[in-house]
Amino acid sequence: MTHIRRGSPPKSDPGFAVTHALVLAAHPMKDSFNAALHTRVVDTLTDRGWSVDDCDLYAENFDPVLSDAERRGYHDVPENRSPVESYVERLEAAEALVMVFPVWNFGYPAMLKGFLDRVFLPGVSFRLEDGKVKPNLTQIRRLAAVTTYGGTRLRAMLVGDPPRKCVTRAVWHVCRPRKTRYLALYDMNRATADDRAGFLSKVGREMKDL
């Protein structure tokens, strides 16, 4: 089910253009810190006057499993999009993409990884021209990730920090946005209440400026 929240354009700016954002959230616990980050993102963007498609993958019972048939038909454009047509349409409608997720085992949660596998398809997120990947989501002009790591940034760097690279390189490449933000709270396992509050405030500020 699509959950769209529409903010009110600032009265002081009659030329204000509403931006439509897709927020992808991937955490199973409603009382988690990640859920608080998700709420802060959606509320801040809505308060800016943006239209927000709030896509909570767990709440929507998204199936992250790529089927045998989907894999076999992966390159069959446009038929490849039919199993996830509604999500493809939501992605294609987005002018901004914000991903809110925890980093587990130095990677994406399976729910979010499955979304990328099933929805970021040939003919949707990219085109293959002479064997080269060309961006196909160039209507997305703003890209952000809001995430938490259990370990320190040094530990993440030692294994290459795959989530950061995937957002700032792979996802960035198929969008080519004007603005990109990667907001991470590292060492979450030892974060204090002040650390968490400070990061929540930072996320709010960054979403106002995205």
Model-derived regions: residue spans:
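Helix-loop-strand module that forms the ligand-binding subsite of alpha/beta enzymes
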Residues: 79, 83-166
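A short, flexible beta-alpha/helix-coil linker loop
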Residues: 28, 149-153, 187-190
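Short hydrophobic segments within beta-strands
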Residues: 24-26, 55, 146
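N-terminal beta1-alpha1 ligand-phosphate binding loop
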Residues: 16-50
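A short beta-strand-loop structural module common to alpha/beta enzyme folds
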Residues: 50-61, 181-186
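Residues at the starts of beta-strands that form the adenosine-phosphate
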Residues: 19-20, 51-53, 141-143, 179
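Glycine-rich phosphate/pyrophosphate-binding loop and the adjoining helix
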Residues: 3, 15, 157-158, 162, ...
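N-terminal beta-loop-helix "entrance" segment that forms/cooperates
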Residues: 57-78, 195-196
